Amino acid sequence: MSGKMNEWESLNTTLNRFTDNVVKFRRDSRTKALKCWRPIVDGIVDYVKRKDDRFHALSVFHKGSYYERSKVGEPDEFDLMLVMDNLELYDEPFEEDDGLSEPPIGFTTVMIDQGEEKPWKRDECVNRRGMLNATRVKAVFKRLADEAIQDMKSKGHWRNVTVKSGGTAVTLKISKDGREYSVDLTLGIKDNTWPEDAEEWKTRQRKGWPKRNLVHDIHEMGCHLVTKQPKGHSPIEQERGFLWCYSFSEAEKKLFLQGEQGEVNSCRRQVLRILKALREELELQPLKSYHLKTLLLYECESQPSARQWSKDALSERFLDLLKRLEKCLRSKECPHYFIKDLNLFEMLNPEKCDELADRVNKILKQPGQVLIRLIK
């Protein structure tokens, strides 16, 4: 047993060195990044609010790894959700026929209340039944963001800013002082009800993490709906634009920031940041940061005690998370943390999963040596 303890202590030391040399980013870099993009985002949001009354109630919700304090490397990527507060949903899902097929798991549709759909008829953002088209709403926002940037460029400002649209977000690319910052702006609607697709999460049998009161608070908080198209599903083509994806960014942020309350020396976020850094340094694509975050949340449920996440247990938790990752890659299954029937690995190439599993296994066999080679 003492031999195993010595191995863990040695790996702990190496993991902490790796964190200091590879994972952490400097505070001055963070301040410089925020000063660069914040005025631009504020300017775009203000312009959009003024120019189109459908977006008059936009509010900014900070999401993603930077705001969960799990960002690795330089602070050059940021995720913001722009919540359309005027479309906040309180009611249970509507019962009337919306004329659309059943949405794939993880997605839903939004019906604008009768009498409130008139402004959304512009740009064909709603159909004749009052169903809100996510794709068209996002396109309108991108057009307005483009206009805002061109307006500022005509006044001699923001010459270093470009905007593009892809996936869930409208992305700003900002170049300054030899660095490029990327800011994803995702349109969202607050849904104060908890989705039926995620009902299992509320009643899931747990060993103590997250605590019942936190589960209750998150359930009562609801979720967001964002403009994201489904992958791996084949809804009727003309219906794809009407699909809104459930987002649990607010719940995830709450889990990371409140799930550790009272755990002064927790290594939860450090383990995640190390895994993210390994993904980047070893080019373990197409694994995404979200996959690793999902696996960490499951590992937190499996190891619920604060003692199991103490700084002294860093090496054990690191190895356990790697084992969980290898197992999921072997089985080609990574269940969404909130919607367990949704497989996040569904679109990954099976052969690529096997290849990644083999690479993770090699790390497990010689974790210290792999980390030392990457320390600069």
Curated annotation (Swiss-Prot):
GO terms of molecular function: ATP binding; double-stranded RNA binding; metal ion binding; nucleotidyltransferase activity
Q: Which UniProt keywords apply?
A: ATP-binding, Immunity, Innate immunity, Magnesium, Manganese, Metal-binding, Nucleotide-binding, Nucleotidyltransferase, RNA-binding, Transferase
Looking at the UniProt entry, the stretches that span the membrane are none
Query: What processes in GO biological process is this protein linked to?
Result: innate immune response
InterPro entries (alphabetical): Mab-21-like_nuc_Trfase, Mab-21_HhH/H2TH-like, MAB21L/cGLR
Judging by the UniProt lineage, the source's domain of life is Eukaryota
The reported result of mutating residue 79 to N is: Abolished nucleotidyltransferase activity
Q: Which cofactor does it need?
A: Mg(2+); Mn(2+)
Please tell me which top-level EC class this enzyme sits in.
transferase
User: According to the UniProt entry, what is the EC number of this protein?
Assistant: 2.7.7.-
What reaction(s) does this enzyme catalyze?
A: UTP + ATP = 3',3'-cUAMP + 2 diphosphate
Q: Which residues bind Mg(2+)?
A: 77, 79
Q: Name one Pfam family in it.
A: Mab-21
Family statement: Belongs to the mab-21 family.
Described by its record, this protein's role is as follows: Nucleotidyltransferase that catalyzes the formation of cyclic UMP-AMP (3',3'-cUAMP) from ATP and UTP and plays a key role in innate immunity. Acts as a key sensor of double-stranded RNA (dsRNA), the presence of dsRNA in the cytoplasm being a danger signal that triggers the immune responses. Directly binds dsRNA, activating the nucleotidyltransferase activity, leading to synthesis of 3',3'-cUAMP, a second messenger that binds to and activates Sting, thereby triggering the immune response via activation of the NF-kappa-B transcription factor.
Can you name this protein? Cyclic GMP-AMP synthase-like receptor 1
Organism encoding this protein: Stylophora pistillata (Smooth cauliflower coral)
Taxonomy of origin reads: Eukaryota, Metazoa, Cnidaria, Anthozoa, Hexacorallia
Tell me the name of the encoding gene.
Answer: cGLR1
